[in-house]
UniProtKB/Swiss-Prot annotation:
Record field: catalytic activity: Release of N-terminal amino acids, preferentially methionine, from peptides and arylamides
Function noted in UniProt: Removes the N-terminal methionine from nascent proteins. The N-terminal methionine is often cleaved when the second residue in the primary sequence is small and uncharged (Met-Ala-, Cys, Gly, Pro, Ser, Thr, or Val). Requires deformylation of the N(alpha)-formylated initiator methionine before it can be hydrolyzed.
PANTHER family in the record: METHIONINE AMINOPEPTIDASE, METHIONINE AMINOPEPTIDASE 2
Keyword Hydrolase in record: yes
GO molecular function, one term: metal ion binding
Family: Belongs to the peptidase M24A family. Methionine aminopeptidase type 1 subfamily.
Keyword Kinase belongs to the record: no
Entry's cofactor comment: Binds 2 divalent metal cations per subunit. Has a high-affinity and a low affinity metal-binding site. The true nature of the physiological cofactor is under debate. The enzyme is active with cobalt, zinc, manganese or divalent iron ions. Most likely, methionine aminopeptidases function as mononuclear Fe(2+)-metalloproteases under physiological conditions, and the catalytically relevant metal-binding site has been assigned to the histidine-containing high-affinity site.
Residues at which a divalent metal cation 1 binds: D94, D105, E233
Cellular component GO terms held in the UniProt record: cytoplasm
Name the UniProt record assigns to this protein: Methionine aminopeptidase 2
Length: 249
């Protein structure tokens, strides 16, 4: 989507704030002994309160309101009453929703409790990589400069990226053009960002793996070698100056 007027921007800001509220409420209430289904219901309550609808449920019939991935699960983890969170788990919450005809997508990874130092470093690297990519998100710049910045930050910290998962355009539907915002440098991607383009920017930073495998449930992606992955995601609007982050409170 390309934002063309203030009404569209306001619509995007509304749904961006809703998913951000849900993300933060889920992170705040996550605790050892809780099932991922219980955590999902916390996100659902926030969406329901504001009249928003889960995007993966609506568009793909996903068996949950939000995606909750734990440890070596990379993305699209199905909320389950049998999946119980433990102290030290690496938890990823990815939540996208629709309100008033506009979509927004956001995600965060965190360690439940103290946990291993390397996992805290991994989460911090994901945040740093997002910020480095964000600096390249300007109208007139090449899309592939985001991937260059993200990958360089990951490697500089001793990590790598999942190359088969990418950011994407968003706005009037969950996935739009540009279809892929790579997390590594693609020399063949010469497209330039247009002013007003709305994208979900989401680095996936890994302790080792660069690819994923399906877990066997038709949805969940995991690493093939038990590597851990942290993701940070925000929906942003590209401008000629600083991008507008729609999913930051």
């Amino acid at each position: 989507m390309i934002v063309t007027n203030d009404q569209e921007l306001e619509g995007l800001k509304k749904i961006g704030r809703i998913v951000a509220l849900a993300r933060e409420e889920m992170k705040r209430k996550a605790e050892p002994g809780m099932s991922t289904k219980d955590l999902d219901l916390i996100g659902k309550a926030v969406l329901d309160e504001h009249g928003a609808v889960s995007a993966p449920e609506k568009e793909y019939d996903f068996p949950g309101v939000t995606c909750i991935s734990v440890n070596d699960e990379v993305a699209h983890g199905i909320p389950s009453t049998s999946k119980i969170l433990k102290a030290g788990d690496l938890v990823n919450i990815d939540i996208s929703a629709e309100f008033g005809g506009f979509y927004s997508d956001t995600g965060i990874s965190f360690v439940l409790g103290e946990g291993e130092e390397r996992l805290h470093k991994l989460c911090q690297c994901a945040e740093n990589a997002f910020q480095k990519g964000l600096q390249q998100a300007k109208a007139g710049k090449r899309q592939n400069q985001i991937g260059r910045a993200v990958y360089h930050e990951a490697r500089s910290q001793g990590f790598t990226v999942i190359k088969t998962l990418t950011g994407h355009g968003i706005g009037r539907s969950l996935h739009e053009a540009p279809n892929h915002i790579m997390n590594y440098y693609d020399p063949f991607d010469n497209a330039l960002f247009k002013n007003g383009t709305v994208i979900a920017l989401e680095p996936f930073i890994s302790t080792k793996a660069e690819t994923i495998v399906e877990a066997g449930d038709g949805w969940t992606f995991k690493t093939p070698d038990k590597s851990m992955v942290a993701q940070v995601e925000h929906t942003i609007v590209i401008t000629k100056d600083e991008p507008i982050i729609l999913t930051k409170l």
